[in-house]
UniProtKB/Swiss-Prot annotation:
The gene is NRKA. It catalyses: L-seryl-[protein] + ATP = O-phospho-L-seryl-[protein] + ADP + H(+); L-threonyl-[protein] + ATP = O-phospho-L-threonyl-[protein] + ADP + H(+). This is Putative serine/threonine-protein kinase A. Pfam families: PH, Pkinase. Residues 331-429 form the PH domain. The active site is at residue 147. Residues 20-279 form the Protein kinase domain. Keywords: ATP-binding, Kinase, Nucleotide-binding, Serine/threonine-protein kinase, Transferase. Its EC number is 2.7.11.1. InterPro entries: Kinase-like_dom_sf, NEK_Ser/Thr_kinase_NIMA, PH-like_dom_sf, PH_domain, Prot_kinase_dom, Protein_kinase_ATP_BS, Ser/Thr_kinase_AS. One of its GO terms (molecular function) is ATP binding. ATP binds at residues 26-34, 49. It is an enzyme of class 2 (transferase). It comes from Trypanosoma brucei brucei.
Length: 431
């Protein structure tokens, strides 16, 4: 049997028989490797990530497909660009943009060795602002990143930073299921308090991780550390951390304090962070510096300037779109025809009528209400789209319960599927 991807990823001796030449390994993961690759067509560099699907559980495979979907749906200068993906012989290949200056974790460790060489305030601010712009784009497109950490912040020689690796780890869903210790290969420094407490999470969990990362950029160390998970959890829930260096302004340090708030209902959204006067002023300075940067293309400048201009012209009141995380919203209603995937050995899709009303999901055989089955929204963990490559059907969404049970439904259209997911998320207080 031929090696997987032999016509796509080859070595220097492959000649014109492949699209990319493998130039060497740059990373190792639980299920495979990442390589620097060179395009045979134009000589440009990219990253080829190869994963062994045979070693993955069904959940891990869903995470891999989710990463592909998230990357493919993103088009932003501060997010690693998706190029293509292929699957052969139980192997998955994802080709994506190459960042030529390593990652932020490496940079922090390098600066922190010996006498710490702190970032200058404008350097730290511009790093943070670019990550905020990336996260604003992700959240505005109804996605979560779920794995924000310094190792996933990639650096380039142009000065642009790029967010990569969308939530391929087990981090959030497994933590909610209460299996933190057996899941993490490392200590979950960036995990939000609501996840340690096994509560529902939403985009505010990404914001917490962003706050931890900002502290790390400014302080050259993580705000919370301990010798074991129990100790780390205690520190995170207490919200105590060492003061940041005096080389940073009090206004900048207050941004960290404002983000690392234990209650997600009191934690700002990214849009609310942009309204902080210090950050708002920083955005204007960032645009000025961006326009003068000759290493960045005009097309990229235009995208970022347009986004910042929209942010600066918008107003977000503190109570706008406010909701309580984990509080059931009894005012949410939605109803319509769906197909439901049955359980057992003979799984099949059956037409059903689904509705959300008075804090309950009610499933019946038909619109007349025959054979009703109810589920309190208190028992619902979340809802999300299922990729076609996984469901083998269009417009499928999954509903996950607090007890770990999953149910799949097929909507009548893509728009209908999005409405169902959003309605369920609003009903359980996470959207």
């Amino acid at each position: 049997m031929a090696e997987p991807f032999s016509t796509i990823l080859g070595t220097d001796g492959s000649g014109g028989r492949c699209k990319y030449l493998n130039k060497g390994i740059v990373g190792l993961g639980s299920y495979g490797e990442a390589y620097v690759a060179e395009s045979v067509e134009d000589g440009s560099l990219c990253v080829a990530k190869v994963m062994d699907l045979s070693k993955m559980s069904q959940r891990d495979k869903r995470y891999a497909q989710s990463e592909i979907k998230c990357l493919a749906n993103c088009n932003h200068p501060n997010i690693i660009r998706y190029i293509e993906d292929h699957e052969e012989n139980d192997r998955l290949l994802i080709v994506m943009e190459f960042a030529d200056s390593g990652n932020l974790d490496e940079q922090i460790k390098l600066r922190g060795s010996g006498d710490a060489r702190y970032f200058q305030e404008h350097e730290a601010l511009f790093l943070f602002l670019q990550l905020c712009l990336a996260l604003d784009y992700i959240h505005s497109h109804k996605m979560l990143h779920r794995d924000i950490k310094s190792a996933n912040v990639l650096l380039t020689s142009t000065g642009l930073v790029k967010l990569g690796d969308f939530g391929f780890s087990h981090q959030y869903e497994d933590t909610v299921s209460g299996v933190v210790a057996s899941t993490f290969c490392g200590t979950p420094y960036y995990l939000a308090p609501e996840l340690w407490n096994n509560k529902r999470y939403n985009k505010k969990a990404d914001v917490w991780s962003l706050g931890v990362l900002l502290y790390e950029i400014m302080g050259m160390k993580k705000p919370f550390s301990a010798s074991n998970l129990k100790g780390l959890m205690s520190k995170v829930l207490a919200g105590t951390y060492a003061p940041l260096p005096d080389s940073f302004s009090s206004e900048f340090k207050r941004v960290v304090d404002g983000i690392l708030v234990a209650d997600p209902n009191d934690r700002p959204s990214v849009r609310e962070i942009f309204q902080i006067p210090y950050i708002n002023k920083g955005l204007k300075l960032f645009v000025q510096a961006l326009k003068k940067n000759e290493r960045i293309s005009d097309s990229v400048k235009e995208v970022l300037v347009t986004q910042v201009s929209e942010i600066l012209s918008s107003e977000v009141s503190p109570d706008a779109h406010r909701f309580l995380v984990s509080q059931i919203n009894y005012d949410v209603t939605h109803r319509g025809h769906v197909n439901k995937l049955g359980g057992g050995n003979g799984k099949s899709w059956k037409p059903r009528f689904l509705q959300i009303v008075r804090g309950q999901l009610i499933l019946t055989d038909d619109e007349e209400g025959n054979n009703p089955k109810g589920l309190n929204l208190e028992q619902v963990q979340g809802a999300c789209p299922v990729p076609h490559s996984t469901a083998k059907r269009d417009f499928v969404f999954a509903l996950n319960t607090v007890g770990g049970k999953g149910m799949w439904f097929q909507a009548v259209s893509h728009g209908d599927m999005e409405m169902w997911v959003h309605a369920i998320q609003r009903g359980i207080g996470v959207a």
